[in-house]
Regions:
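Short acidic, glycine/serine/threonine-rich helix-capping segments at coil-helix boundaries
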Residues: 217-288
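Second-shell loop/turn segments in exported
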Residues: 26, 51, 102-105, 136-149, ...
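Bacterial N-terminal signal peptides
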Residues: 6-14
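Acidic, His- and aromatic-enriched active-site or binding-groove loops in soluble protein domains
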Residues: 29, 66, 189-213
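Positively charged n-region of N-terminal signal peptides that target proteins for export
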Residues: 1-4
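Active-site-adjacent loop/helix surface patches within enzyme catalytic domains
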Residues: 20-167, 171
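Surface-exposed patches in mature extracellular/periplasmic domains of secreted proteins
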Residues: 161-176, 239-243, 264-267
């Protein structure tokens, strides 16, 4: 290594200068690296969350932002009664929040996403730890609601982020469970996705379109391969196997946690399927013809 630096120094002497000039001409052919926003819940209290997200460990994780659940009454609170956002990683740097993940066939979402952790002490455990093949039926979760002031602060943060990255598509504002359905359940069924949609953040379905598909499907659901294809078209990392296997049930469960939180069993039903196709028609309309056989589209 010492000889390497000596060689570099010699080259600089031979060239006769130690710096160089640049001409900056901004190309029109570029865009932001940020295409996704991933929302998490911490499953820890604030102090534990902050330590987990900022200190080195055997399994290091981080996020760009952390939102507390309430104003902190201690010496570290410099904001009075105002709830602050904690910025932990600069948006132009990669935070380690998504883990093994996929959305719309894009993998390793850490590279192109902003991660937001919302403090919420929910808890999920597998009831059968000895079973290496995880099953939807073996997940036991205790979910908790989110305080109004916490969600109001999240709204302000999201509006601010979207002003900087206006090209982020509504369907690409996702839950951790959306992009890692076999591993994650956060932020959970109490997270107010519809409330965010009502102020222009994220995706949601239209009721008239939902009613149309609810009537189309009736009590006769299409084959499992069509269901897998529809989930995949919208963005969920579900392999098309033609079998109602566990990876499919995890995908359905993640979808239900986001869009039909009243029942997230992982079993596809008429209501969930109508919501899914209402979303596809709204946000993936160019893909709808692929399902003409089951929708009787002429």
């Amino acid at each position: 290594m010492r000889y390497f630096f000596l060689s570099i120094s010699l080259i600089i002497l031979l060239i006769g200068c130690s710096d160089y000039k640049t001409v900056e001409i901004i190309s029109e052919n570029q865009n932001s690296r940020i295409d996704y926003i991933v929302i998490h819940a911490t499953s820890q209290d604030f102090d534990e969350s902050l330590e987990t997200l900022t200190k080195h460990s055997d399994y290091p994780v981080s996020s760009h932002y952390l939102i507390p659940e309430s104003v902190r009454e201690d010496e570290n609170n410099y904001f009075g009664k105002e709830l602050p956002v904690y910025r932990l990683v600069d948006e132009h740097r990669r935070a380690w929040h998504a883990g093994v993940s996929s959305w719309r066939d894009e993998v390793s979402l850490n590279d192109r996403s902003i991660g937001i952790e919302v403090v919420n002490e929910f808890d999920c455990e597998y009831t059968n730890d000895k079973n290496t093949d995880k099953s939807v039926d073996e997940i036991a979760c205790q979910f908790l609601p989110f305080p109004v002031e916490q969600i109001d602060l999240l709204k302000l943060l999201l509006i601010d982020i979207l002003e900087r990255y206006p090209r982020i598509d509504p369907v690409d504002i996702v839950a951790h469970s959306d992009i890692a359905p076999d591993r994650k359940s956060d932020p959970g069924p109490y997270f107010p996705w519809k409330e965010l949609y009502d102020i222009g953040i994220g995706a949601w379905y239209d009721m008239d379109t939902y009613d149309k598909y609810f009537q189309i499907f009736g009590t006769n659901l299409p084959d499992i391969e069509s269901i897998q294809s529809a989930l995949r078209v919208y963005g969920y990392p579900v392999e098309i196997t033609g079998i109602n296997d566990q990876q499919t049930k995890f995908g359905v469960r993640a979808f239900q946690l986001h869009f039909r939180p009243s029942n997230f069993s992982g079993d596809m039903d008429q209501e969930s399927l109508a919501i899914l196709f209402a979303l596809i028609e709204k946000y993936r309309k160019h893909e709808l013809n692929a399902f003409s056989g089951i929708l009787n589209i002429v």
